[in-house]
């Protein structure tokens, strides 16, 4: 029963890491990355549809994304969605494909994005600490209900803290790597 608490906390922390990785993937780093377009939804036959479900996204060059719609009639809808997005990238269409050239980041933009990365990383660490608190509360509840002994509670708290420390360390590494990637010229 006690290990279940640690495993559940570990699983929730893994989900936080995955969420952070997705969020970092959507932060533009001056080079083409298909995950930049993950948040783009296109109104396709009256339904909001994720872009990657109605078009293939390829990276022919380091700073170019190529969007090839499966249905050529949807190209105007895709262009409209890309223009309305907060990417800051103007799509260029030749009628069958849409080319997105990722502009080089200015030094100021790089610093702003690095601040954003730090903020997102801090939010992820807060989520990890909340998971730790929930796990600790569950362990204390079990000890109070006499399901585990006081010694088992102390061991469990140490295990939860170790898992938390590992998760926070991993988030720090992810954040540092993303910052380094952003600040590279």
Swiss-Prot record:
It comes from the Bacteria. One of its GO terms (biological process) is translational termination. Disulfide bonds: none annotated. Its main location: cytoplasm. GO terms for molecular function: ribosomal large subunit binding. The keyword Protein biosynthesis applies. Responsible for the release of ribosomes from messenger RNA at the termination of protein biosynthesis. May increase the efficiency of translation by recycling ribosomes from one round of translation to another. Belongs to the RRF family. This is Ribosome-recycling factor. It comes from Streptococcus sanguinis (strain SK36). The gene is frr.
């Amino acid at each position: 029963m006690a290990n279940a608490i640690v495993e559940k906390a570990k699983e929730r922390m893994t989900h936080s890491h995955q969420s952070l990785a997705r969020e970092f993937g959507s932060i533009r780093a001056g080079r083409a990355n298909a995950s930049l377009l993950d948040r783009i939804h296109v109104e396709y036959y009256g339904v909001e549809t994720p872009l990657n479900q109605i078009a293939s996204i390829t990276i022919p060059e380091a700073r170019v994304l190529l969007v090839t719609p499966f249905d050529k009639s949807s190209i105007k809808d895709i262009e409209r969605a890309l223009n309305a997005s907060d990417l800051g990238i103007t799509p260029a269409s030749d009628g069958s494909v849409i080319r997105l050239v990722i502009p080089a980041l200015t030094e100021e933009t790089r610093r702003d994005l690095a601040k954003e990365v730090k903020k997102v990383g801090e939010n992820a660490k807060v989520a990890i600490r909340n998971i730790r608190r929930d796990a600790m509360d569950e362990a204390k509840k079990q000890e109070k209900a006499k399901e585990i002994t006081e010694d088992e509670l102390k061991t469990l708290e140490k295990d939860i803290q170790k898992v938390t420390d590992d998760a926070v360390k991993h988030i720090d590494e992810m954040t540092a790597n993303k910052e380094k990637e952003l600040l590279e010229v």
